[in-house]
């Protein structure tokens, strides 16, 4: 699922609309017995909402992690992102 429109949404109304489109796409993928992955534009501030969607099996977040790693180191950048994703996934 391409999450770019969600990531680039301006304002709460547009973000909610794009989030709901992602939720619907994940549901349709699940109904078709597809393995659903999601990503594009996800970063430390917006990943938790997407990661909390039941049915997503993998997130693609590379750019944000590498950008953060420039300042904090790769291990810390990955650890921080993993903590955010795990926290959100626990709410599923």
Can you say where each PLM-predicted feature lies in the sequence?
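Glycine-rich phosphate-binding active-site loops on the catalytic face of alpha/beta enzymes
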Residues: 1-10, 55-74
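Catalytic cores of alpha/beta
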Residues: 38, 42-56
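C-terminal helical cap(s) of enzyme catalytic domains, especially alpha/beta-barrels
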Residues: 11, 15, 68-91
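Conserved, mostly hydrophobic/aromatic
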Residues: 50, 62, 81
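Short, well-ordered coil/turn segments that N-cap beta-strands
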Residues: 30-35, 55-57
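Generic structural signal for well-ordered alpha-helices
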Residues: 22-27, 47, 75-82
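Histidine/lysine/aspartate-rich catalytic loop segments that bind and position anionic ligands
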Residues: 1-28
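Contiguous, function-dense segments enriched for cysteine-driven chemistry
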Residues: 18, 33, 45, 90-92
